[in-house]
Structures are given as structure tokens and as C-alpha cells.
């Protein structure tokens, strides 16, 4: 059985090379809207998406993420858009809720021909004083946990084919 959604799921790949051009507002809004329709525990919608396209803010996030990683590289791969996904730290299912948002963002991006990749270490970034100050600067008050960064842009290269699925991936009982 196949359909467009299943094909998008099977063909989505993490993109780690981006063209410098910014994505359009129409593309961005479509990806963001898909993120807001992610399933959430009891419909609480505990996640929040922060759009970062400003060069200074992108550089700050890149530096903070690299510091957590212990490297002096660009963990955002030069992507022109970073979507920071946060979740209410007091929500019982904050991490699953935010993770579903991340999945929707990446699948929506793939459906539009955009590249995306989940970049880790958001939790550690926003546990720091600098991270908490950044949230306040963005007007985000309260207790939030960083779920991930969904980087977006136009792919600079074609994606590699998927690796074969491991034979014991599924167990039917």
C-alpha cells in the first residue's frame, strides 16, 4: 500500500548541507502550521515553536549548541532557518509532545522539498543562564524544556537513499 504521505515518510532524510537562500514565508508558514497540528497528550499543546532567522540570533544558538557539544563547528550546518521547539516543563508529557512537533515539522518540510534535520542539545542549551536569558529576551516566560532544533533550508545536495531497515525492527505478537 502506498500514498503521498507514506512516500514522504519513507523518503525524508536529514539534510546537512544547505543553500544560503532563505526559505519563503509561505513555505515557513506551511511547516509551522503542520507543527501546530502535532498530536499532544490530552490536546494540551504543551509545545512552543520559536522561529530564528536573524543572523545574530542564529549565530548565538549555533555557538551555544557547539559549546554543549564541546566543539568549535557549526552544528546547524549553515541552515538559514532554525525552529527551536520547547515544551512546558510542567506538562506531564512535555518531551513526547515536543518530539511529535519536531516530527511534523520535518515531514512537512520534506513534503515541500525543503531540507531539515533534528539538532539535539536544546535541553542543555536552555538549562544554562544564557539560554534562560535568551528565552526572556524572546518574551518567553515560565519554565520550558528544550526539545530540539529543526533546521530548515533548501538542500545543497540530493539526499542519500535510506539504509535498509533492520530485520528485527517490528515484532508482531
What are the functions of these language-model segments?
Residues 1-173:
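Acidic, surface-exposed loops and disordered segments
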